[in-house]
Amino acid sequence: MTIDNPSAFLKTLPTGSGVYQMQDAQGKVIYVGKARNLQKRVSSYFRRQLDSKTQAMMAQVQSIQTTITRNENEALLLEASFIKQFRPRYNVLLRDDKSYPYLYLATHQKFPRLDFYRGAKKAPGRYFGPYPNAGSVRENLALIQKLFKLRQCSESFFKNRTRPCLQYQIKRCTAPCVGYVNEQEYRRQVEDAILFFEGKNDQVIIKLTERMEVASENLVFEEAAHYRDQIRQLRRLQKQQIITGGKGNIDIIGIAESNGAIGFAILFIRSGRMIGHKPFFPNTPLGTTLQTALVEFIPQYYLSPLRNGDIPERIVTSEPLEDRLWIQRALSSGLNRKLAITDQKRAPYKQWQAMAALNAAQALSQHLAQKNTFALKLEAIQKSLALPNPIARIECFDISHTLGEATVASCVVFGEEGPIKKDYRRFNISGVTPGDDYGALRQALTRRYVRLKEGEGILPDVLLIDGGMGQLRQAAEVLEELQVSGVILTAIAKGPGRKAGLEKLFVWGRREEIHLPADNIAFHLIQQIRDEAHRFAITAHCNRRAKRRVESTLQEIEGIGPKRRQKLLKYFGGLQELQRASIEEIARVPGVSETLAKAIYDDCHQHKG
């Protein structure tokens, strides 16, 4: 509804709970808010005394839409949904585009597998986490394997083993695949690992001590020594780890402000053990208070579908939280247990709140320093290449193939804060003569910029091509055909001897090459962007080539059809294991003669590499 007459408009608003959307002259949502009393809350925006941020926002507001909800909890949930949908410029916007990783234990299997997992929790079993990042998961996975020796391999690999793999040799698995440990013994390993995950290290140590004593009494000294080493590792770990004094799952949220920017840091406490922390730097309108930022951050973070509904038993904030009970009730509404949110600085959380705030301040300081550094480097590129306008966004393309096989093009994107990985794209090239880099580049650029013209992204200020004037000409022709304007076209070509630091730069529309000094910061950033595009292209190409070679292996051997090929791969647990096998081992596969085994062996080694 438009607000030509605010007084009359406000009288039409309901007094119940709901959500309001503020829109500008183009109908774009620029702010979303929740309210216990819509009329009272929206009326507050029409007072004479408003802070500078709210004044700037209200100067753009042309209409306000309201949505009535059944209760306050529903209003908070709907607000979070609208913020995610509309991304309003005056809201605090959380940029969190990756789902959270877990450790997954497939307890339904006869010999449960422990592995890294990311995504929706659909498979049966136990999920431990979420962890702040993949590094934390892998670190804990390595620790669990060292302590409890649980298998990590896939089911097909596990079921078709005829000998232990490397994990057994380095003492990271007990090789249940070949019967070196029975189901009962392996289940005991699994139970110990679960107790460890639950923070019950003392119980694990008691059980291991009992087993050590039994083994010693039975004169099985090697087994007793194994339990002794496990106990020592666990006790050493207990001393190294920071323990909260509790056994539950807690998130400690720290917040800090610097030069108008706001940063968060969450300490993840799981089963009384800190497993890591993660910083966040949401888009925050100038003038946003810490309390406002905290109120908007928490629902967005915990209601994100990327979290799979994982909310700990307790959330502790380093600053006072307005509407604390309201947020607590709303977040609890979808849970079958209690949730507590604490903002008071008292034992046992006081030291954790201080630590979280310190982590937030340090992470924000580093983030702003990196942002300023990148902004200076982008400014240096503009000056060094004598470009007419400031640079906020650069895209770089590279082509990768092996003698024309499995050609892939990469597109990487850099902005004022560094690489924007969520905007990276890769293009599998098809219908182009093998080895035709120009044709591959034209196809990738056409696909990319058709989508950008259709609104599926943001046009860059600068398009950088890994190549020379020939590649640059292809880019210019594509953009001209698509009638894309306002993008500066540049290229970086290898110099004499392909030595780093001797590269040549080109700008479309200029005849002369540009040579920048090797210590020029603009040159360093251009090299960094080019190298990132190259890395991304190489990775995608290698994956595509490997997939093709797996598909082509065995296809030309007489007597090997799709079913037998699949049977072979399943028997050995994959192509790599088949390639490692001898002729005698291949001949043990049911239905494979020695002659056929030799043909398979020869074909595998022809495709290997």
UniProtKB/Swiss-Prot annotation:
Coiled-coil intervals, chain numbering: none
User: Per its record, what are the GO molecular function terms?
Assistant: DNA binding; excinuclease ABC activity
> GIY-YIG domain location, by residue?
15-92
State where it is primarily located. cytoplasm
Q: Please verify whether the record's keywords include Cytoplasm.
A: yes
Q: Does the keyword DNA damage apply?
A: yes
Q: Where in the cell is it found?
A: Cytoplasm
Tell me which GO cellular component terms the UniProt record holds.
cytoplasm; excinuclease repair complex
Xref: InterPro entries: GIY-YIG_endonuc (IPR000305), GIY-YIG_endonuc_sf (IPR035901), GIY-YIG_UvrC_Cho (IPR047296), Hlx-hairpin-Hlx_DNA-bd_motif (IPR003583), RuvA_2-like (IPR010994), UVR_dom (IPR001943), UVR_dom_sf (IPR036876), UvrABC_protein_C (IPR050066)
- What biological-process GO terms show up in the record? nucleotide-excision repair; SOS response
- Residue ranges of the UVR domain? 202-237
Alphabetically sorted, this entry's keywords are: Cytoplasm, DNA damage, DNA excision, DNA repair, Excision nuclease, SOS response
One Pfam family, short name: HHH_5
Protein family membership: Belongs to the UvrC family.
HAMAP family of this UniProt entry?
UvrC
Which PANTHER family has this protein been placed in? UVRABC SYSTEM PROTEIN C, UVRC/OXIDOREDUCTASE
Sum up the protein's function in the record's words.
The UvrABC repair system catalyzes the recognition and processing of DNA lesions. UvrC both incises the 5' and 3' sides of the lesion. The N-terminal half is responsible for the 3' incision and the C-terminal half is responsible for the 5' incision.
Q: How does it assemble?
A: Interacts with UvrB in an incision complex.
Name this protein carries in UniProt? UvrABC system protein C
User: Upper lineage ranks?
Assistant: Bacteria, Pseudomonadati, Pseudomonadota, Gammaproteobacteria, Legionellales
Gene expressing this chain? uvrC
